[in-house]
Amino acid sequence: MATTKSFLILIVMILATTSSTFASLEEMVTVLSIDGGGIKGIIPGTILEFLEGQLQKMDNNADARLADYFDVIGGTSTGGLLTSMITTPNENNRPFAAANEIVPFFFEHGPHIFNSSTGQFFGPKYDGKYLMQVLQENLGETRVHQALTEVAISSFDIKTNKPVIFTKSNLAKSPELDAKMYDICYSTAAAPTYFPPHYFTTNTINGDKYEFNLVDGAVATVADPALLSISVATRLAEKDPAFASIRSLNYKKMLLLSLGTGTTSEFDKTYTAEETAKWGAIQWMLVIQRMTDAASSYMTDYYLSTVFQAQNSQKNYLRVQENALTGTTTEMDDASEANMESLVQVGENLLKKPVSKDNPETYEEALKRFAKLLSDRKKLRANKASY
């Protein structure tokens, strides 16, 4: 009798633990963040293709798309472009681009976007006309409110000197943010010295014209928009009960996948205080942006790694980044076929590398683990909705 009682207690404990695990997974808030980096967007594009392929296999659904699994998808610069590609609906209300169409998009359009240089000292390096044309052709008249999941795309208004964050959740309060996706994409990619700033207008809540004068989102949020994406997810908690689990920044209830576009710890050349002591504006201008982007991305990753680990949820955060780019792969505007092929190889090789010195798990294994969590969570929510 005692043995039977002990056995029943054990079963109850197992069921309770299992139930708690699944409940926790069901409540997870999922966030995807994609860095800026111009043509280097090929690297996260390669990673996204792998991830979406895994989700399709796990769910036995060739039509499965990343927007079906993430509550918030955020990006800046080329990351904003990728965000739009995988969240903007087509005529069937599905993402107009599958993940395996991202890299071919760069190969087809990259050489034309980064072409027709107009001279870097007396104007932007590129006129941006082809970029705007291809965005209009692919994104059409779609606006922010039509995105298939919550988005977080950053830009910076040089007239008001304030960052502008385009999200669905802000539209009720600020309808002027319901801009056309092609205007948003061009704006977040309009890196100073590379492309001209972008001017366009929308309507305010009173029907008045509201004007934007925007440049690259990296000016507002640095190249890594992970913190921005988290803040948008957190704000959703104030309005949607489904996000209640992160109202107090409970990172145990959040899955964050952050994709970088690659950096190098050496910047191709190192410098000493002595040799830079007499540098002027031009010398610093040639290297400071790369240094700043790399340093800020490192600090964002350091902060997120620390807070997730502090809540014993380090497995919930995955930063996929190549830190050893060399040669032309470090350039954001080298759209030669040879360099683009090299960037694809960087992405594919990255999948085989360990996540860190302390974590022998490869990025491929980590992404498969993430895919399993995303798949299971989607099924749990679908089952709950059917009752």
UniProtKB/Swiss-Prot annotation:
Glycans are attached at residue 115. Pfam families: Patatin (PF01734). Residues 32-230 form the PNPLA domain. Residues 361-385 form a coiled coil. One of its GO terms (cellular component) is vacuole. It is an enzyme of class 3 (hydrolase). A motif (GXGXXG) lies at residues 36-41. It is found in: Vacuole. A motif (DGA/G) lies at residues 216-218. The active site is at residues 77, 216. Its EC number is 3.1.1.-. PANTHER family: PATATIN GROUP D-2 (PTHR32176:SF85), XYLOSE ISOMERASE (PTHR32176). Probable lipolytic acyl hydrolase (LAH), an activity which is thought to be involved in the response of tubers to pathogens. This is Patatin-08.
